[in-house]
Amino acid sequence: MQTPGVLLLILGLLDASSSALIRIPLRKFTSIRRTMTEVGGSVEDLILKGPITKYSMQSSPRTKEPVSELLKNYLDAQYYGEIGIGTPPQCFTVVFDTGSSNLWVPSIHCKLLDIACWVHHKYNSDKSSTYVKNGTSFDIHYGSGSLSGYLSQDTVSVPCKSDLGGIKVEKQIFGEATKQPGVVFIAAKFDGILGMGYPFISVNKVLPVFDNLMKQKLVEKNIFSFYLNRDPTGQPGGELMLGGTDSRYYHGELSYLNVTRKAYWQVHMDQLEVGSELTLCKGGCEAIVDTGTSLLVGPVDEVKELQKAIGAVPLIQGEYMIPCEKVSSLPIITFKLGGQNYELHPEKYILKVSQAGKTICLSGFMGMDIPPPSGPLWILGDVFIGCYYTVFDREYNRVGFAKAATL
């Protein structure tokens, strides 16, 4: 028979673990870009001509205050998890995106010609006992047009299914999308987006889900962490943990960098080295840590230098190809952050993909110029995060990295 002291200790441990840590399994799917390429379609036919700007901050002509204009695409997003909205929860697959701050899902009231809405789960306020009408219109500007709809309030369950444990974020304002831009989202495997950036970039100044979660004291620590499985065939695709970290997913100690601007998860990068032949970001630069971006993104001219240094040749859609037989001889690329070296070996920054029945090797780097005042910026997307377990700390406004474990 257990002694009362032992029983109390066990119950205390169980209670601490259930209240402090929330695990959301992540699944990995084929990205929109790859889906379109595999069926012979051109992404360029689906989006506006010219480059897609992902990040832009501009001033309001009337108030002179900074106004966030999120020009973000999810062509390369690959990792999704499930949340619930309403009571009982209606389940949705979302991208947990540290590069934006709003939650939106398709609405049951979406426009008749919104084909993307037809093929995704839709929120129905009539089926929720905790729904509260808001009705304020919202618009999020993407490279392919404007996603629009109206705001509503309801309970958000993370994750959706109660048998996985989880939390309920009450009185969460979110977007019901009634119109999605172009036809890009038709090919998306996800229903919506759950932004995990700072409130500063939230459209309509809506309190982000994680901020509401902190306000309601639903986790012991105000942090969340990502493990992304980079095995192309591996499932689960990874795990998002709310309220803590899991040492099973990384080796050694976490090294932290302070957030330099509380909008995106922005940090200072000392420099970037391509083997011993090329140094980029000389004198330091700014970088965004973004779970909603699959690739590594940098200023166009610098990325062109990098592609040339690794022998990559341009394809369409801004992609660069490497002969697969040369991958093993490519240089190590080193990101210097906070005085620490974060190395990416060629098999990590070169992506093997299927195209027209053949396997080709693509560079994991893409060039994109982000204009001032936000830019220029580098974006450390899933290629980097897959190699380094990443902690987003709102308690101390910092980002932590440690070498990811291979499971």
Swiss-Prot record:
Acid protease active in intracellular protein breakdown. Plays a role in APP processing following cleavage and activation by ADAM30 which leads to APP degradation. It is an enzyme of class 3 (hydrolase). One of its GO terms (biological process) is proteolysis. SUPFAM superfamilies: Acid proteases. The active site is at residues 97, 290. Residues 79-402 form the Peptidase A1 domain. Its EC number is 3.4.23.5. GO terms for cellular component: cytosol; endosome lumen; endosome membrane; extracellular space; GABA-ergic synapse; lysosomal membrane; lysosome; melanosome. Residues 1-20 form the signal peptide. The gene is Ctsd. N- and O-glycosylated. Keywords: Aspartyl protease, Disulfide bond, Glycoprotein, Hydrolase, Lysosome, Protease, Secreted, Signal, Zymogen. Glycans are attached at residues 134, 258. This is Cathepsin D. GO terms for molecular function: aspartic-type endopeptidase activity; aspartic-type peptidase activity; endopeptidase activity; hydrolase activity; peptidase activity; peptide binding. Residues 21-64 form a propeptide. Disulfide bonds join 91-160, 110-117, 281-285, 324-361. It is found in: Lysosome; Melanosome; Secreted, Extracellular space.
